[in-house]
Amino acid sequence: MKRILLTLCLIGFLMTNLLSQENAIKVDSGYINVDGGKLFYEMAGRGDNIVLLHDGMLDREVWDNQFPLLAMNYRVVRYDRRTYGKSSDPLAPFSDIEDLNQIFIQLNIDKAIVFGMSAGGGLAIDFTLKYPGRVSALILVGAVVNGFYYSPHMMNRGGHLKNPADLSDPQKAIKYFAWDDPYEIYSENVSAKEKFVKILESSQHKSTGNFYIPADRPGANFLSEIKIPVLILVGEYDIPDVHAHSGVIQFGIPKSRREIILNSGHLIPLEQPEAFNRTVFNFLNRMFFNILYSQGMDAAIQYLNIKKAGNPDVKLFNEGEMNAWGYRFLQEGKIKDAVELFKLNVQAYPGSANAFDSLAEAYLKDGQKDMAIKNYEKSLELNPGNDNARKALTELKGGNR
């Protein structure tokens, strides 16, 4: 937990030193062969796997403000999809879903937390639906989902795109989306606009022609099959269609969570990196509770046991939040689950009188009077001033006479 808190405190400082951080971490890069092409990838860090999927306009560099920071605590992979960055152009029909699966296979990624930006979010959803065992959590950023429509407002950019034919000219398209479009990048985020131009001018989007193979089934119709923790992020000033898509995703995926990032358009990781990173790390650092909420007690315990097998001293939760979840379960009548949560809390925080007091209360509600007495006594031993434990013991032991 100390390491987690330290990481959060350092985010602001690190964001001003990303270049030096990227130089400091060891980045492995290269190409993997896929059916009819090559994909360029970069990989850094150690720990749980994270895979970063870029949007439909830029390339892997959209994650420049996140890649080195995430690599401090995770094994992070980012790559250019076909037609982007350093990856090859398609010469035959190809599937982004199967390309991503090859990233997993060839880079020895058993399971990963997948970040998907815009169209990359749609890919993340489609991949999760086809290969559910490979994805442990999703972070969807300005995501659009296949199978849900786009309005005319999206097509003409709210009337701001006067001549759609201009977008066939790469330079005119760059100028429009960087400086004229009110949705792609919020007007005040000038540095993000400059970065956007730099990325596109160095690696302009290439057409996939008729080679792109869509998903077997539209993701929008099958969102309820996704049962993992999902965080949905949308920029305050993103185009209304993207907000609509995010609503469809949130409604469709059980227990998913949506947040709005202020003062941002579509490209949140470029526009508001500090707010984005803070929100993402909060989600990542609460993964035990995310799993508990979305998948239930058994999955959360399994996650905890796997983590403890690698590091017996690891603390994956805050004492106060675990206590709050325990009482939430008590209120919902999930007494057995509440007991298990409070037991985990005293195991993680054996010096906490409050943790033992709460466990005693749960045991009492579960009808386990002897265990309640034992834990109230432990609480009182740790804190002789705990009047609640003293009163409870007087009543419980008096009832034994």
Predicted feature locations:
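Conserved alpha/beta-hydrolase catalytic His-Asp/Glu region
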Residues: 149-150, 168-224
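Catalytic active-site module of serine/aspartate enzymes centered on a nucleophile-bearing elbow/loop
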Residues: 256-294
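Flexible "cap/lid" loop of the alpha/beta hydrolase fold
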Residues: 129, 138-167
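Active-site loop/oxyanion-hole signature of alpha/beta-hydrolase fold enzymes
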Residues: 78-115, 119
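Short beta-strand/loop motif that positions the catalytic acidic residue
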Residues: 226, 232-234
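Conserved HGGG/HGGXW glycine-rich cap/lid loop of the alpha/beta-hydrolase fold
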Residues: 37-86
